[in-house]
């Protein structure tokens, strides 16, 4: 609920920061990013996707990379070779099947209960894909065979959830994505209203010191300020 009320404010701030907002109704943000990344690559750009999410590994190519934060600080750059080495895969598209088997709680992908990363990697190394695995469950033994056979639909659904679309109906306009300076005339009042005081310190002095009466105005009209959240 909280994030739903915050979205309009987030968009206001991004607009004032001159950060483009790309969205398509009915599609996840991952799908929009996947589509834009591949369209940009086709136009000759080298693309970096800043994300910790494993599922983005399926999108990497020779010119599309993951820029993944490390737990110890800093970032790692992952291309096809790095993704395959990291997860013991033959090609980066196997990331989809890997997550379909092991799941990913951060992305609400259930996977096959009782199958962890190590087992999922072993299964993909042996069978190559979920389809081949499900067609060859007679080659499995004991508890593992039972787990896979009893969760066929869950595995297929998890693979669907792990798949990032790259055909979202959205145009790639490179010019509209060029970096622009923040519009402090719009941004400073928003920071002040939301009491983002540490961020407000980044504003140029004249802007930061202007409209000093904004707090008293906000206190005088609390209802108006609240209604803004529902715009």
Regions found by a protein language model. Name each.
Residues 1-171:
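Extended two-metal-dependent nuclease catalytic cores across DNA- and RNA-processing enzymes
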Residues 150, 160-231:
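Low-complexity, acidic/Ser/Thr- and charged residue-rich accessory regions of DNA metabolism proteins
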């Amino acid at each position: 609920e909280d994030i739903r009320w915050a979205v309009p404010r987030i968009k206001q701030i991004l607009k004032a920061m001159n950060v483009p907002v790309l969205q398509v109704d009915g599609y996840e943000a991952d799908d929009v990013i996947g589509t834009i990344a591949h369209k940009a690559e086709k136009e000759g750009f080298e693309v970096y996707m800043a994300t910790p999410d494993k599922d983005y590994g399926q999108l990497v190519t020779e010119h599309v990379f993951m820029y993944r934060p490390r737990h110890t600080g800093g970032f790692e750059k992952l291309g096809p070779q790095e993704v395959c080495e990291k997860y013991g895969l033959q090609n980066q598209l196997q990331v989809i099947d890997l997550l379909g088997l092991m799941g990913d709680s951060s992305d609400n992908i259930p996977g096959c209960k009782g199958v962890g990363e190590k087992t999922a990697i072993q299964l993909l190394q042996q069978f190559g894909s979920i389809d081949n695995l499900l067609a060859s469950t007679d080659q499995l033994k004991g508890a593992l065979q039972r787990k896979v056979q009893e969760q066929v639909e869950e595995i297929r659904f998890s693979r669907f959830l792990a798949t990032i679309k790259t055909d979202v109906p959205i145009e790639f306009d490179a010019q509209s994505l060029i970096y622009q300076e923040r519009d402090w005339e719009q941004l400073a009042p928003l920071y002040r209203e939301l009491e983002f005081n540490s961020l407000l310190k980044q504003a140029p002095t004249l802007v930061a010191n202007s409209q000093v009466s904004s707090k008293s105005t906000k206190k005088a009209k609390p209802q108006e300020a609240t209604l803004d959240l529902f715009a």
